[in-house]
Curated annotation (Swiss-Prot):
Subcellular localization: Cell inner membrane
Sequence similarity: Belongs to the type III secretion exporter family.
Organism (species): Treponema pallidum (strain Nichols)
Function: Required for formation of the rod structure in the basal body of the flagellar apparatus. Together with FliI and FliH, may constitute the export apparatus of flagellin.
Lineage: Bacteria, Pseudomonadati, Spirochaetota, Spirochaetia, Spirochaetales
InterPro entries for this protein: FlhB (IPR006136), T3SS_substrate_exporter (IPR006135), T3SS_substrate_exporter_C (IPR029025)
TM stretches of this protein: 51-71, 97-117, 161-181, 202-222
Name of the protein: Flagellar biosynthetic protein FlhB
Its membrane topology: Multi-pass membrane protein
């Protein structure tokens, strides 16, 4: 023992508190949507096995309780069938095997179906959807590690290990007391079974067993709720990222910052050039606040009206301001402005289907009025 003045004796065996710290030290950032999506594609989702087991046990126990008369009747039927033919049946007769299989399927299929559906329902409750991933069932030999120290560290000296140990102790204790008090309340009924028939005794014992199963199942559902929230927190912690990992992911998604800066400068240059081309337009068609499209038409060398500038929000405001300063017609036409903005690139001709709408606008311009009068 190591003693210090004014202190309590310290044991030689000291547990390193770092064993209880987060294993992924330095990972302080919450996982991004991309990482969560990749984990989901790999079949890794927050899931409580206790909640799955509790759901399966609850619904299976309820089904057994409700189907008890049917199960008892079928069991008696199969016993009667084989016992009444025991002396006359031939071992070489394969028909008896199929009779047994038929009885077995009638007894097992309903319960198996309920267990399957309840298991799927538990997963849907936890993840709001049905998830199937082939990656999660592929063998991963890299997970087989001979690191015994790490195994014991994770199993006994980690937050998850301590939580699982405490959870198991509480569940065992609670199940024991629930079963004990349920049976103790009906303990005196066991004495009266000596004076009743075998069928009544079996019925009473199965009813009591079903009651215990239902109570224990409900208890397990209640106990599985904290485990569900704990597993969700552990899942998020396991996917946490360092700041460098977040930066790398953003770089992969959006490209290198230098490339993004170059692209942004090119886009700004195009916007400025587009705005300058506004002064060459004959008309500016607006949304009126969100979009602005400048259209030019010179019959002498153009086969169709051409979009020379366009923009949204701030760029649209600049285009309208330049058009107003240059005395260019600004025409409000929401459907046409939206269609030209989304479908026609700068420098491209306007599609034929919009000619009728443009003709109505261009006839308001003096130069096209003169051109039309000359044609007449």
């Amino acid at each position: 023992m190591i003693e210090q003045e004014g202190t309590f004796p310290l044991p030689l065996f000291i547990i390193d508190l770092q064993w209880f710290a987060a294993e992924d030290e330095g990972r302080s950032e919450d996982p991004t949507e991309t990482k969560l999506r990749k984990a989901r594609e790999e079949g890794r989702v927050p899931k409580s096995q206790d909640l799955n087991g509790a759901f399966v046990m609850l619904f299976t126990s309820t089904s057994l309780f409700l189907l008890a008369p049917f199960i008892l009747r079928e069991c008696i039927g199969v016993l009667r069938f084989f016992f009444t033919r025991a002396t006359t049946a031939s071992i070489q007769n394969t028909g008896w095997f199929f009779v047994f299989v038929r009885y077995f399927m009638k007894l097992a299929l309903p319960i198996s179906f309920v267990a399957l559906v309840s298991g799927v329902a538990a997963n849907i409750v936890q993840n709001k959807t049905v998830l199937f991933s082939v990656k999660s069932i592929r063998p991963q030999f890299k997970k087989i590690s001979p690191d015994v120290i790490r195994f014991f560290k994770r199993s006994f000296f980690s937050t998850e290990g301590l939580f699982n140990l405490l959870k198991s102790l509480i569940k065992i204790t609670a199940i024991f007391f629930v079963s004990y008090f349920t049976i103790r309340n009906d303990l005196f009924m066991f004495v009266s079974l000596l004076g009743v028939s075998l069928t009544q005794s079996i019925f009473y014992i199965t009813s009591l067993a079903g009651k215990v199963l239902l109570e224990v199942s409900l208890l397990l559902v209640v106990f599985s709720l904290p485990d569900y929230f704990f597993q969700r927190r552990q899942f998020i912690d396991s996917l946490k990222m360092s700041r460098q990992e977040v930066k790398e992911e953003l770089k992969e998604q959006e490209g290198d910052p230098l490339v993004r800066s170059y692209v942004r400068k090119q886009m700004q240059s195009l916007v400025r050039e587009s705005a300058r081309n506004t002064t060459d337009a004959d008309v500016v068609i607006t949304n009126p606040t969100h979009f602005a499209v400048a259209v030019q038409y010179e019959p002498a060398y153009m086969t169709a009206p051409t979009v020379v500038a366009k923009g949204s929000d701030g760029t649209a405001y600049r285009i309208k301001r330049l058009a107003k300063e240059a005395g260019i017609l600004i025409e409000e036409n929401k459907p046409l402005a939206r269609a030209l903005y989304t479908q026609v690139a700068i420098g491209r001709e306007v599609p034929y289907e919009y000619f009728n709408a443009l003709v109505l606008i261009f006839t308001k311009l003096d130069k096209f009025k003169t051109h039309a009068q000359r044609k007449r």
